[in-house]
């Protein structure tokens, strides 16, 4: 898994978001709960991880780096 993989998933689910440059995407309302649910679902399927409601915090979804770090933590939990 790479950040590029995460970026590809995010762009597929929410193509109108500036994922490359965003640092507070959820806080700024550029990423909504529907985007998060779609991305989380794809990440869970692809990487066999569990993303819970507790993980749906802006600090986990504000940028590609944040999403990547979330997935890394989840992979390490297994």
Predicted regions and their residues:
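C-terminal structural segments of small proteins and small subunits
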Residues: 54-76
């Amino acid at each position: 898994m790479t950040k590029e993989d995460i970026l590809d998933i995010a762009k597929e689910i929410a193509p109108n978001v500036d994922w490359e440059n965003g640092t507070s995407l959820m806080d700024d309302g550029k990423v909504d709960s529907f985007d998060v649910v779609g991305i989380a679902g794809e990440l869970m399927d692809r990487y066999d991880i569990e993303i819970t409601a507790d993980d749906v915090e802006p600090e986990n979804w504000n940028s590609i780096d944040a999403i990547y770090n979330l997935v890394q933590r989840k992979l390490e939990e297994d």
